[in-house]
């Protein structure tokens, strides 16, 4: 990866972190910090797709899909409240992944949002197809998210 790509990944990590930080309350931020610490490791032990399945299963999309799509569509998260539940922290981590994929043009944002709303299985199938590319490119970004969470979210 070139130095320019690395810088773009770090910049995207800061943007995504800022969006989820503002969309979560204090309790959910603490839970998100745990997700950021654990999920990056899980992706590289179990693989991207199995970990993604787990994250999706925990994100509560059946009740909160509109919040996730609003966050993906929004240039700012000021008016979006993901809540304080465990689901909110998983949804925030799912957002971080999907934000990277759309902003780095690995997957089209309109396709992503459409499939989140209408056909998650088709989205998962597309992500499975792209998983070798995703796995090779996303690690630095997720490590930056992890470090930001560790540095900026205090846990009692």
UniProtKB/Swiss-Prot annotation:
SUPFAM superfamilies: AF1862-like (SSF158568). GO terms for biological process: defense response to virus. InterPro entries: AF1862-like_dom_sf, CRISPR-assoc_prot_Cmr5. Its main location: cytoplasm. It is found in: Cytoplasm. Part of the CMR ribonucleoprotein complex, consisting of crRNA plus Cmr1/Cmr2/Cmr3/Cmr4/Cmr5/Cmr6 at 1:1 and possibly 3 Cmr7 dimers. A Cmr2/Cmr3/Cmr7 subcomplex without crRNA can also be isolated. It does not cleave target RNA. CRISPR (clustered regularly interspaced short palindromic repeat) is an adaptive immune system that provides protection against mobile genetic elements (viruses, transposable elements and conjugative plasmids). CRISPR clusters contain spacers, sequences complementary to antecedent mobile elements, and target invading nucleic acids. CRISPR clusters are transcribed and processed into CRISPR RNA (crRNA). The CMR complex degrades RNA complementary to the crRNA (target RNA) within UA dinucleotides, generating 3'-OH and 5'-phosphate ends. Belongs to the CRISPR system Cmr5 family. This is CRISPR system CMR subunit Cmr5. The lineage of its organism: Archaea, Thermoproteota, Thermoprotei, Sulfolobales, Sulfolobaceae. The gene is cmr5.
